[in-house]
Amino acid sequence: MKRVLSTSLSVALATGLYGISFGAIGVAAGLDVLSVMLLSLLMFSGASQFAFVGVVSAGGAPITAIASAWLMGVRNSFYALRLAPEFGPRGLMRFLQAQLTIDESNAVSAAQVGSSDRKLGFWLTGIGVFTFWNLATLLGAIGGNLIGSVEAWGLDAAAAAAFLGLLWPRLRENLPLAFAGGIVALAAVPFLPAGLPILLAAAVALLPIGRKK
């Protein structure tokens, strides 16, 4: 139990602190503190949140931002399929587990041996990340407001940079597909509203380009 607790706490703290970046970047994208906090409280998926503010900062339509966030968060559904048979949540616990089903809680849970440790790892990590992430988001959002002009500090480009940072490890796994998506997105920029090119690039990811057989 001590090992699970230690692992969960360290993962939760390290991941949660990254929320400072999201808070500051969300404000830089033009959102107010309340909107930034609602994203962390309700959406609670780092990649999806960065995708959302990335589209917003580029001037994209809200529906495009929502679609981008959904595409980034769809993997959590597959985590839920793995966890549901063992956890078997009912009632309100089902909604709580769904909210806490993220990369970190799934990873810590999967690394444990016994069923009780897997459940403990999931809940401790999920609750820990949720707590630290939201506290850090608040600090980042308030700090972003105190900075003043985000353009003067170069933070207006931070959302796109953070989004790319999240994607880069996966892009390296299939460079031909990444380049194809990039070319499609760049070609679409002059003709489509902001935010739609990235959705076209995501569609390219479904093509069998450069995949290992």
Question: Where would I find each of the regions flagged by the language model?
Answer:
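Pore-lining transmembrane helices
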Residues: 6-98, 116, 197
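Short, Lys/Arg-rich, polar N-terminal cytosolic tail immediately upstream
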Residues: 1-3
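Helix-loop-helix junctions within the multi-pass membrane cores of secondary transporters/permeases
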Residues: 66-156
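Membrane-embedded alpha-helical modules
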Residues: 119-203, 207
